[in-house]
């Protein structure tokens, strides 16, 4: 082998040693794992071993490492189940998972299409519920009735007073017919009052001051101007009725006395 080849091989070996030394200097030793160790303690011990600074010396011959500190027992911390069953822990983990989840690159067309589909489904669902309510309660007109605007008490429409229709003026023929009808009613009432007058003995032959429809009224009016009106006749009729009631009571008392006398004498009634 030539001297040039030996020199190249020596340089290659030196380079390999340098690479290995650099690799060993940047590597971090892990604590030994024992089979009897708890997995939670092993995880925490590894975390502490990686986080604690380690003094290292690199050389071509040997590597010296400082021993990690004694592992801390975390069994007492993790024995409680409430740490992992807390709602805040669950909600925070869900938020972190949502934040770390990859975003979907949805296009605007697909989003618009999805929104249209959701709107159509909501409309169909609402219509189905409305139809079900109408069928169950028979309130179709009530459900579809538009809300009416409520008027405030202060804004009530002023009610206009109703105007009476103007009276039509009667013609001459209508006036004559109306007067004849009223005269007939008046004469009928006067005749009834005149009949009461004839029942009363002390005014039966007196003349009346009102028209009764008799033929000799004009002749009697010329002979005697003093006449009885309707109020006077009604007053006399009331006095006469009271007089008759009093006489009836007297007759009843006298009749009772006569019956008692007949019974005393041994007669029969």
Curated annotation (Swiss-Prot):
GO terms of biological process kind: carbon catabolite activation of transcription; cellular response to hypoxia; filamentous growth; filamentous growth of a population of unicellular organisms; negative regulation of filamentous growth of a population of unicellular organisms; positive regulation of glycolytic process; positive regulation of single-species biofilm formation on inanimate substrate; positive regulation of transcription by RNA polymerase II
Which stretches does UniProt call biased (Basic residues)?
159-168
Q: Where in the cell is it found?
A: Nucleus
Q: Which SMART domains match?
A: HLH
Could you tell me which residues belong to the region Disordered? 146-178
> Record's InterPro entries?
bHLH_dom (IPR011598), HLH_DNA-bd_sf (IPR036638), Regulatory_TF_Diverse (IPR052099)
GO molecular function per UniProt: DNA-binding transcription activator activity; DNA-binding transcription factor activity; protein dimerization activity; RNA polymerase II cis-regulatory region sequence-specific DNA binding; sequence-specific DNA binding
Q: Does the keyword Transmembrane apply?
A: no
A Pfam family hit? HLH
The reply on keyword Transcription regulation is yes
The record's induction entry says: Expression is controlled by RTG1 and is down-regulated during mating process, yeast-to-hyphal transition, and in presence of benomyl, amphotericin B, and caspofungin.
Please give the subunit comment from the record. Efficient DNA binding requires dimerization with another bHLH protein.
Name of protein:
Carbohydrate metabolism regulator TYE7
- The primary gene name is TYE7
